[in-house]
C-alpha cells in the first residue's frame, strides 16, 4: 500500500489563504513583499499587497513567513501505528 503524498507547500499556502493570514514573502534577490495570498498554482503565487495584485513566480521565492503560526494538520496523512 502506498502512502499518500503530503504536499506541504500547497497545504501551507492554502491555509494562509483560507485564514487570511498576512505573510511576508522573501525573494531570492532580497526583496520583501507583504500581503495576503489570494491564490497559487504550481508555478506562481498571487499576493494582494496595498490594494494591488502581484503574481510572484515561485522560483523567485526563498521564504514565506506568516504573521502568526499556521495550523496545518497532517495527522490524516500519517501512517497508522502498529500495535
From Swiss-Prot:
The entry's keywords: RNA-binding, Stress response
InterPro entries: Hfq (IPR005001), LSM_dom_sf (IPR010920), Sm (IPR047575)
GO biological process assignments: regulation of DNA-templated transcription; regulation of RNA stability; regulation of translation, ncRNA-mediated
Keyword hit for RNA-binding: yes
Keyword Heme attributed: no
Pfam families linked: Hfq
A single cellular component GO annotation: cytosol
Summary of the function given for this chain in its UniProt record: RNA chaperone that binds small regulatory RNA (sRNAs) and mRNAs to facilitate mRNA translational regulation in response to envelope stress, environmental stress and changes in metabolite concentrations. Also binds with high specificity to tRNAs.
HAMAP family: Hfq
Family: Belongs to the Hfq family.
Subunit structure: Homohexamer.
Identification of the protein by name: RNA-binding protein Hfq
Organism: Pelotomaculum thermopropionicum (strain DSM 13744 / JCM 10971 / SI)
Gene behind the chain: hfq
